[in-house]
Amino acid sequence: MSEKTFLVEIGTEELPPKALRSLAESFAANFTAELDNAGLAHGTVQWFAAPRRLALKVANLAEAQPDREIEKRGPAIAQAFDAEGKPSKAAEGWARGCGITVDQAERLTSDKGEWLLYRAHVKGESTEALLPNMVATSLAKLPIPKLMRWGASDVHFVRPVHTVTLLLGDKVIPATILGIQSDRVIRGHRFMGEPEFTIDNADQYPEILRERGKVIADYEERKAKIKADAEEAARKIGGNADLSESLLEEVASLVEWPVVLTAKFEEKFLAVPSEALVYTMKGDQKYFPVYANDGKLLPNFIFVANIESKDPQQIISGNEKVVRPRLADAEFFFNTDRKKRLEDNLPRLQTVLFQQQLGTLRDKTDRIQALAGWIAEQIGADVNHATRAGLLSKCDLMTNMVFEFTDTQGVMGMHYARHDGEAEDVAVALNEQYQPRFAGDDLPSNPVACALAIADKMDTLAGIFGIGQHPKGDKDPFALRRAALGVLRIIVEKNLNLDLQTLTEEAVRLYGDKLTNANVVDDVIDFMLGRFRAWYQDEGYTVDTIQAVLARRPTRPADFDARMKAVSHFRTLDAAAALAAANKRVSNILAKSDEVLSDRVNASTLKEPEEIKLAMQVVVLRDKLEPYFAEGRYQDALVELAELREPVDAFFDKVMVMVDDKELRLNRLTMLEKLRELFLRVADISLLQ
């Protein structure tokens, strides 16, 4: 069977840059699934994506599906015919489904009985006939949140479509895709190369598009070229380009023929906090800032043009003229904001609603101020500085700079606080209160910042849960999942002595009578413990290890983490599996007994050598391990408890627990309860698989 290269290119108007990669990857995944489901043999499925096109190139695509033999077993002969030998309705229905009559069916006979049988040789359908529907189906399944309609057509797609190229080898596959008749026509760059040309063979793609159309269709190639050229451009001016992955991806999705150029701005703008300048360059203009080796921002930026110009200086000058007013605005806002103290913005917070039922940003500020001070006292941070940071925490939201450049909230509070002469840890806390903003983000760097960051997040959690608006499904408008995980990360990774129980109770108390959910404290804690589950799963811990610790519901995050590490280590011990099984057995025995047990084991009632030995070791370990539990040395405790494997195994081998003698039975149950309690001081080991 011969094989050919298949090409599909959808020529469109400019596609959404932030969605370009996902559209292309989904197109490739969908089409690969179509090929596999159809049983079509194929080689590599390569995707291409540029601002005005999505394309796939499939190597070694078979010309047809393989022929196949099919067998369909019908009703048993006893049910297929009536007493007169006439076909039953069941038999006739089965035959119609196979496209035959009952008398055309074969018989299948085995030692288990006899049935009607349909056998057929099915010839594989040609690839050419299958491709149009496969392409259309793959496009219809793309993750497009909002479809467009254009012209008088009822066709919907992410952007208007102008060309559809379908080539199997050198042959055009006739089809109408997204309202466009397929052809071998491809459009090139808007301003360079040939605006439109024909492609003779699928194998010519994407090289022909580069040569004749001046378009680099390979997304990864464009991205790599931009990165390499930008690094070289920065090196030439003695700096390092800020090539963040997200911006690099976006710029690669905006250009078809990337040309990297270097421009500059006036040095006077460097007096403005670099974060505001960078926000303008990266967020608004899609420029790459350049830093000196000491980390200071240079008065230069790198940008990517979508054209090779005979006069690149004209393009450079144009971009410099575009960015200058934005930088001038930042300079003006910075100078204007500093004419008054940060604290002077407090009254204006009363005019901004935090949440309708929970009050204004000023109300939130007062709660954060009190909660940050309370947290600071618990963790040994400067209480005065923490309350001061809480008071100023939202003031920068009222500044001109943050109003215009919203992503500078926090960092501008830090700069304005420094200008006002606030303590350095207070200023830093204003910037770091929102950390961690995402997975892997840095944590607050000092105790005051930790107190403020936790206070801000806990106030939001308590408030939103307190009015019954907890996250449902994928919806989380107040980013409560991120807030909860942020609190847990700070407490665990900074090893802070905080208890979620008292922390949540204090956050709830500060709301007064505004909250309507009577179970808010438990709801918040359960939600946060649920975040622990997701966190530790991401860290590679097994689900049953997490469940074993969650079963004890430890509300001190640092303590929770210590238990997780202890149980994970315990699982590596030789005795772990046997003791987990024994704990499960003990748990089941105790659950089935409704008898009232004693507080302690009666040594005089012990009878068998195995129970005497086990009881003695339980008593010894109980006394020995008490300091371990008090100090949170759970790993050491479980290592010691692992020594119980032999006496526990011997006990269950030789001793019957549920004997008729009530005194003996209760004493043995009590001993098992004391044994289980030792393990439960760490986790429910019986849940380990």
UniProtKB/Swiss-Prot annotation:
<dbReference type="GO" id="GO:0004814">
    <property type="term" value="F:arginine-tRNA ligase activity"/>
</dbReference>
<keyword id="KW-0030">Aminoacyl-tRNA synthetase</keyword>
<comment type="subunit">
    <text>Tetramer of two alpha and two beta subunits.</text>
</comment>
<dbReference type="GO" id="GO:0004820">
    <property type="term" value="F:glycine-tRNA ligase activity"/>
</dbReference>
<keyword id="KW-0963">Cytoplasm</keyword>
<dbReference type="GO" id="GO:0006426">
    <property type="term" value="P:glycyl-tRNA aminoacylation"/>
</dbReference>
<dbReference type="Pfam" id="PF05746">
    <property type="entry name" value="DALR_1"/>
</dbReference>
<keyword id="KW-0436">Ligase</keyword>
<keyword id="KW-0067">ATP-binding</keyword>
<dbReference type="GO" id="GO:0005829">
    <property type="term" value="C:cytosol"/>
</dbReference>
<dbReference type="Pfam" id="PF02092">
    <property type="entry name" value="tRNA_synt_2f"/>
</dbReference>
<dbReference type="GO" id="GO:0005524">
    <property type="term" value="F:ATP binding"/>
</dbReference>
<dbReference type="InterPro" id="IPR006194">
    <property type="entry name" value="Gly-tRNA-synth_heterodimer"/>
</dbReference>
<dbReference type="InterPro" id="IPR008909">
    <property type="entry name" value="DALR_anticod-bd"/>
</dbReference>
<dbReference type="GO" id="GO:0006420">
    <property type="term" value="P:arginyl-tRNA aminoacylation"/>
</dbReference>
<protein>
    <recommendedName>
        <fullName>Glycine--tRNA ligase beta subunit</fullName>
        <ecNumber>6.1.1.14</ecNumber>
    </recommendedName>
</protein>
<keyword id="KW-0648">Protein biosynthesis</keyword>
<comment type="similarity">
    <text>Belongs to the class-II aminoacyl-tRNA synthetase family.</text>
</comment>
<dbReference type="InterPro" id="IPR015944">
    <property type="entry name" value="Gly-tRNA-synth_bsu"/>
</dbReference>
<keyword id="KW-0547">Nucleotide-binding</keyword>
